[in-house]
Swiss-Prot record:
Keywords: Cell membrane, Endoplasmic reticulum, Golgi apparatus, Lipoprotein, Lysosome, Membrane, Myristate, Palmitate, Phosphoprotein. Residues 21-33 are annotated as: VCP/p97-interacting motif (VIM). One of its GO terms (biological process) is negative regulation of protein-containing complex assembly. This is Small VCP/p97-interacting protein. One of its GO terms (cellular component) is Golgi membrane. A lipid is attached at residues 4, 7 (S-palmitoyl cysteine). Residues 18-37 have a biased composition (Basic and acidic residues).
Length: 77
């Protein structure tokens, strides 16, 4: 009897500081986001390579500017 409560001499275990809690929560959130981003993808590297290639093509199109006036012409005779 009487063993339901801890000894009064024992103190509660120290809780982590708010900064440590914040860091752990941020790490957990980043891990969840990373897992959610790769869910359902078997080959992550190929998807990333395709994304980089697409970005490079878009960048190249943006830097090339509008087409010149020497393009195709429509003539009606």
């Amino acid at each position: 009897m009487g063993l339901c409560f801890p000894c009064p001499a024992e103190s509660a275990p120290p809780s982590p500081s708010p900064e440590e809690k914040r860091e752990k929560l941020a790490e957990a959130a980043e891990r969840r986001q990373k897992e959610a981003a790769t869910r359902g993808i078997l080959d992550i590297q190929s998807v990333e390579a395709k994304k980089k290639k697409k970005e490079q093509l878009e960048k190249q199109m943006a830097t090339s500017g509008p087409p010149t006036a020497g393009g195709l012409r429509w003539t009606v005779s």
